[in-house]
Structure formats: structure tokens, C-alpha cells
Amino acid sequence: MGSSKKDLRALPADVVDVFGYALYVAQTGKRHDHTKVLKGFGDASVLEVIESQAGNAYRAVYTVRFAAAVVVLHVFQKKSKSGIETPKPDMDLIEARLKKATELVKEGRP
């Protein structure tokens, strides 16, 4: 959704490899070891892949809410000073993209 694919490609190659494999694992119905449920969405269908490289934290957020596809909602380098919590602007973007994905699925567009 949105700029997620472009954002993913801008990350370090090792991070892209981890996220790519984690998304492949999600497509098989399983969960990668670096994946956890992202809280605040009411169920376990929005997940976050967490990767750290050279002191930097990276996140890929996706949903398995739809039968037709695993939808990547947001990919970013975490720069929050508030500990492990995902920053509010990122959470707002994830929520907006999830809403848009839900609308597209209801319209019959995967």
C-alpha cells in the first residue's frame, strides 16, 4: 500500500532480505521469528516484523486480514525516542492504509 514497496527498497539489503523472507513466510500461513502482533488493531491480523542492524531499528507492518493477499501497510526505520512503542504518526499511517485496503477488498479489488 502507498509507498511501502519504495520504502522497502530504500532499506539496507540485509533488512530487505529479512523482511522479504518474513513476508514469504506470512504467505505460507506461518509467522517469522522476528514477527509480533501490532497492538491497537483489535485482533492478531496486523503484524510487525522487527529487525535491527548496526544500531538502527526497522519495521515492516503487514496484515493477513484478507484471504486474497498479505498486504504490506508500512515499512520504516524506527526513530522513536519513546522506547519500543511505534510512533503515533506511523500508527496513524498504518491505520489509514488498513482502512484503504479494507475498502479495496470490499470493492473486489485485491
Task: For each feature predicted by the language model, list its residue ranges.
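Basic, Lys/Arg-enriched alpha-helical interface segments
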Residues: 1-57, 66-69, 78-110
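Hydrophobic/aromatic beta-strand elements that line small-molecule binding cavities or substrate pockets
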Residues: 60-62
